[in-house]
């Protein structure tokens, strides 16, 4: 019968080397370009009647957490998003609203080509100079407005981590003992608890006759 040490052996081969553990569990294939930024700590406990998996996910909304079991592998993944203050949110909105639209980019195709200006260069050179001057003035005004809207907050310490997280747990050696229909999850105070009950009765052995 498999013990808790069997699944812990596949979970972490060296508890004293977190870097190697992260590199092993967070490695992705070439086709998957998702970068794992956070390796949340995990506790796994096997009791007489259930398997308990606890994962610390402080500062993460339950809407940003995904849990699934595929090919005997339990996967906990999601994203810890950075909270923006009102001033930073306003900057994001302004940048998105001032970005060039497709209609603006398409209108450049209707602008006259340089060959059309060659027929009458002198009169249009003055107009061109005036346009450049006006554009320069408008650009300076835009830069002044951007400087006014830049956040004035100064961050002295930044130790919190944000981004994607992912943890794997290989249940192959104990899966036959578990009742997957009894999976229960609870997320409270930043702690995700997954409970899987053991099967009440193992099936009786089946005798096979030889013909």
Curated annotation (Swiss-Prot):
Ranges annotated as biased composition (Basic and acidic residues)? 140-152
- Amino acid composition bias (Low complexity), ranges on this chain: 89-105, 124-139
Q: Which UniProt keywords apply?
A: Stress response
Where the record annotates domain sHSP, the positions are 33-211
Which portions of this protein are annotated as coiled-coil regions? none
Pfam families in the record: HSP20
Q: Which PROSITE patterns match?
A: SHSP (PS01031)
- Superkingdom assignment: Eukaryota
Q: Where is this region: Disordered?
A: 89-152
Q: Which family does it belong to?
A: Belongs to the small heat shock protein (HSP20) family.
In Swiss-Prot or TrEMBL terms, this protein is called Small heat shock protein hspG8
From which lineage does this chain's organism come?
Eukaryota, Amoebozoa, Evosea, Eumycetozoa, Dictyostelia
């Amino acid at each position: 019968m498999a013990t808790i040490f069997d699944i812990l052996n596949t979970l972490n081969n060296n508890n004293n080397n977190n870097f190697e553990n992260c590199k092993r569990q967070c490695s992705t294939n070439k086709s998957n370009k998702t970068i794992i930024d956070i390796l949340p700590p995990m506790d796994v406990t096997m009791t007489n009647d259930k398997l308990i998996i606890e994962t610390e996910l402080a500062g993460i909304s339950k809407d940003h957490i995904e849990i699934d079991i595929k090919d005997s592998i339990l996967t906990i993944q999601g994203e810890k998003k950075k909270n923006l203050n009102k001033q930073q949110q306003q900057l994001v909105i302004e940048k998105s609203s001032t970005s060039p639209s497709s209609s603006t980019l398409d209108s450049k195709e209707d602008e006259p080509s340089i060959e059309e200006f060659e027929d009458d260069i002198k009169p249009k050179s003055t107009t061109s100079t005036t346009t450049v001057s006006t554009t320069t003035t408008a650009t300076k005004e835009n830069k002044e407005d951007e400087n006014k809207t830049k956040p004035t907050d100064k961050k002295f310490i930044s130790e919190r981590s944000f981004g994607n997280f992912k943890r794997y747990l290989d249940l192959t050696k104990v899966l036959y003992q578990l009742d997957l229909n009894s999976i229960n999850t609870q997320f409270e105070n930043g702690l995700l608890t997954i409970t899987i009950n053991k099967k009440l009765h193992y099936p009786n052995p089946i005798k096979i006759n030889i013909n």
